[in-house]
Amino acid sequence: MELNGARLDLDYSKKKYQELIDYTDQVAQWAKGNYGLSIGSNQQLVRQFEALNVEITELTDKGQKSASKDQLKLISRDGSAEAKQLADTTLKYRQALKLANTYFANFINDNTDGFVHPSINTMGARTGRMSIQNPALQTLPKGDDTVRRAFLPKDDDHVIITSDLDQVEFRMFASLSQDPNLIQLFLRSDATGSDPFTEIGREVYQDQSMVKSDKRRNLIKGVVYGRLYGAGVSKQALTAGVPEEQMRAVSNAFDERYPGMQRFQKYVEQTGSTRLEAEGQGYVHTWTGRRIPCDEDRVYTLVNYLIQGGAAEVFKSNLVKLDQADLTDLLIVPVHDEIVLNAPREDAEEIKQLVRKCMTTTDNWSVPLTADVDGPLENWGAKYV
């Protein structure tokens, strides 16, 4: 994949880079004109928020008050109208600056004849997840098409096909927890084509009219992935943008319906603590037998290591299956749980079916680890529009 590289739409990249830089310049002028501050300065932002009667609770590693992303989200949720506007604008400014400098500037400056050749580290994280550098594609905003639109098929005779594992970490969590209600829900969801989070919401809220666009669905996702990443209720509430009491009520209702997840979470943490006391090291073994240790004071991370590490192994196993299916020359880049491919235009539908087969895992799991396949696409971002 590193040798193949990815073809870029350089005209689009240059246009988007300039749009983002123009936007950040306008925001910087707005902040200077209205508040006399440099919006890129943490200290100046903190002082301005305190002048707006906002309590800053987040701290840097050096103990200084911080206008961090989490702090800005908190202000956006609970602050006055003026404080909320400044927080929201700062978040948008930072995102635009990151997209411009981390991605589009690198696309423009570092391409080779219109192609970029990312560096892929197959063990880039402790869990075994891959990391992608030059450009850092693993930090792409999930579900955003802005940067992805710059990625094109290798020529006009090819199209883009992508395949993304479906809620793979949640499915693994459900399988390992052996919660019967959760397993049956996934099996039913797969059979009917319904959305698992919406199905859970209908049961937790006892509202069969709930649809996928319902905002309460995000609270269900917040509980699930909060457990997975070791986040407490307060952090889950901040991420979801709701009061802590509301999030706690959803969490409690979820546990009443699906107690197996919390039970499994406690089992993993207790096992890790026992190993730490007996062996001097807390750790878990993934489904392939790979051992992942945790820091001494972070036993709570073991659930995440177990699930995320296992998901990384499933994804890599699927890449091996793609190789065995003679699709290696079509692979462009892996990002998160998604693989992006070139496909000859006339063979796109046939290749889609082959990719779906390779990316789906049913053996050894109570809940099938399924995959979406999208295409044919004229650019990667078209999937997310």
Model-assigned labels for residue ranges:
Residues 165, 337-339, 371-373:
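A structural signal for short, well-ordered beta-strand segments
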Residues 153-155, 326-327, 332-336, 363-366:
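A structural signal for short secondary-structure junctions
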Residues 54-57, 122, 205-328, 333-334, ...:
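Conserved catalytic core of nucleic-acid polymerases
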